């Protein structure tokens, strides 16, 4: 019986009677046997939406690689993987190739901020597909797909009925879509950690040692992705679960010697080797980039304590309303179970392993959020491990509510949220486009007709979800919501290409605006037409993402005037001349001081990012 039926008030949706018998049969037998055609259809739905959300617009074959690397981390990590590949290919002995895979290098200098798992995976993908920004993102995409697939299989095995909802909600939430397309280490840790924790719970429920391999193997991968935070979080979640259930013996049973040997056999070789080759590794990695990053604001990522509440709400879009209700439901059910266990009138055997899944998911969801809320450095990717359990809770909650119906206000709130998200996406080009477009003319104002069209589309999204859910049942809510997301992604990335089918060029406007506004790739293409790859490129007052982006796309470190001085030879200079809302940064007067009378002339302009490109003569 759905907990929400006892806790919520208000009129509920009419439920198809067949769903009630379906749900009762599911909970009675613990497994659901669907006809083969139904299983094939379910798998087809799962694969279509999952592949679309993870792949479309990422590669040149499906939707086009519409967005270059963004932020400072993506081009930096991609460049490290590229340099590792160069060192690997240039080595002629087994020892040399192994050493090339140990120490990450950035512009020829050791970069010891993160372990090497992402660099290894990106390096070999570069070897197979070439050095591209989209191939630099494939490590995250592939791990996300494996994680979502195993969520589907795990739920189908241990929580049948809600498995497709859980998998699709995971695949179709903003946090997973975004980080699965990132050339970063966040998904490299979150996905293996999620798989490992699901494996541990499978062991807890079945008592089969086979599943214990999961927690040790995948936690080992997560450790090689981000370091000791992975086993720390896994241990903290399991210990908290044992404490809540008062089953302390499971901690001793979890300490399984074959698993421990497997974990250290995976992790220790790289950590020992990198410490041997780089004596400063322990200080730089463990002390500076782990302890100091948590305890101080040295890296200037300070945010308020409640920051991650906002991040989680945005990461779960468009499922945030349902996710919040599911999380509250899970907390209430966990409290009820805890009180039942403490009650002196509790019947023997009332607390069975199957009853513990919501408690496990709630702890898994909340512990990373609470833990990193105390960190002095806060970045959105830190709480990515909390997204899968919240999505699973949401999928399981929706399935359990099929028999009792979903509160109308919750459904309406979910639909309205999807409408608001639709409106925000449709207005996105207006928010990010500069006040002056590339030809020097002012950007046209938003017309009344365009605004009415956007409002109509948003209202259409709301009505689509309401009508489909009311007409075909709660089981179709996932399809209606995912269909809205598909339409929004087509609006952002445009239509095509699909392998040999060419794209519809008129639909690519939005992604081109985003690419020119946030990525250095179009600017690097412009510079490539102005100067050969061997010519020096310098930057002045630009953001770090521009600096690292130009370095990756040119495969050569750019010179920063403020850090390295002015090169003596002739070079191209990229300087930021305007700030937000077109504010003048008085860059020209500052350049006069740096160049000290040297001749320079403007050769290109990049208004989307407030940049100018100059040709600076030799000294």
Where are these regions (language model features)?
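Membrane-integral, polyisoprenol-dependent glycosyltransferases
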Residues: 2-4, 8-408, 424-432, 500-501, ...
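Membrane-embedded architecture of ER/inner-membrane glycosylation machinery
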Residues: 16-39, 213, 326-619
């Amino acid at each position: 019986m759905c907990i929400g039926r006892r806790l919520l008030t208000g009129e509920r949706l009419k439920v198809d009677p067949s769903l009630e018998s379906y749900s009762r049969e599911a909970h009675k037998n613990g497994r659901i046997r669907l006809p083969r055609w139904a299983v094939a259809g379910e798998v087809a739905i799962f694969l279509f939406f999952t592949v679309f959300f993870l792949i479309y617009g990422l590669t040149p074959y499906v939707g086009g690689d519409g967005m270059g690397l963004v932020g400072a981390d993506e081009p930096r990590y991609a460049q490290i993987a590229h340099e590792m590949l160069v060192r690997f290919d240039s080595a002629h002995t087994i020892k040399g190739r192994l050493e090339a895979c140990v120490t990450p290098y950035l512009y020829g200098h050791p970069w010891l901020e993160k372990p090497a798992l992402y660099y290894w995976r990106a390096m070999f993908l570069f070897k197979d597909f070439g050095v591209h920004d989209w191939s630099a993102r494939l490590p995250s995409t592939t791990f996300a797909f494996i994680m979502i697939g195993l969520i589907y299989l795990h739920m189908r095995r241990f929580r049948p009925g809600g498995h497709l909802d859980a998998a699709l909600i995971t695949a179709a939430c903003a946090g997973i879509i975004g980080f699965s397309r990132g050339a970063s280490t966040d998904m490299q840790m979150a996905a293996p950690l999620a798989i490992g924790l699901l494996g541990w719970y499978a062991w807890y429920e079945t008592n089969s040692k086979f599943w214990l391999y999961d927690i040790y193997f995948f936690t080992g991968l997560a450790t090689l992705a981000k370091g000791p935070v992975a086993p720390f979080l896994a241990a903290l979640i399991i210990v908290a679960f044992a404490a809540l259930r008062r089953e302390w013996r499971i901690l001793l049973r979890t300490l399984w010697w074959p698993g421990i040997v497997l974990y250290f056999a995976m992790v220790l070789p790289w950590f020992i080797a990198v410490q041997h080759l780089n004596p400063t590794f322990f200080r730089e990695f463990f002390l500076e980039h782990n302890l100091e990053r948590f305890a101080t604001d040295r890296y200037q990522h300070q945010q308020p304590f409640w920051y991650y509440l906002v991040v989680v709400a945005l990461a779960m879009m468009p499922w945030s309303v349902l996710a919040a209700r599911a999380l509250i439901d899970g907390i209430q059910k966990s409290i009820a179970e805890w009180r039942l266990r403490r009650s002196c009138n509790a019947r023997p055997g009332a607390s069975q392993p199957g009853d513990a899944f919501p408690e496990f998911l709630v702890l898994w969801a909340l512990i990373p959020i609470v833990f990193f809320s105390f960190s002095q450095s806060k970045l959105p990717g830190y709480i990515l491990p909390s997204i899968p359990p919240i999505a699973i809770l949401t999928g399981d909650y929706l399935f359990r509510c099929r028999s009792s119906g979903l509160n109308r206000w919750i459904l309406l709130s979910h639909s309205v949220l999807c409408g608001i998200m639709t409106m925000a996406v449709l207005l996105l080009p207006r928010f990010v486009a500069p006040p002056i477009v590339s030809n020097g003319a002012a950007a046209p104002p938003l017309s009344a007709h365009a605004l009415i069209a956007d409002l109509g589309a948003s209202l259409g999204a709301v009505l689509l979800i309401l009508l489909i859910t009311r007409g075909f049942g709660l089981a179709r809510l996932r399809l209606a919501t995912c269909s809205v997301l598909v339409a929004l992604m087509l609006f952002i990335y445009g239509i095509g290409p699909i392998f040999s089918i060419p794209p519809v060029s008129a639909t690519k406007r939005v992604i081109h605006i985003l690419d020119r506004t946030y990525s250095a790739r179009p600017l690097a293409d412009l510079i490539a037409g102005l100067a050969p790859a061997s010519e020096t490129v310098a930057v002045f007052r630009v953001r770090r993402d521009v600096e690292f982006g130009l370095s990756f796309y040119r495969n050569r470190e750019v010179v920063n005037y403020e850090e390295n001085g002015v090169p003596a030879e002739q070079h191209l200079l990229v300087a930021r001349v305007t700030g937000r809302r077109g504010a003048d940064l008085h860059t020209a007067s500052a350049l006069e001081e740096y160049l000290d009378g040297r001749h320079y002339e403007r050769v290109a302009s990049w208004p989307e990012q407030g940049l100018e490109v100059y040709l600076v003569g030799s000294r």
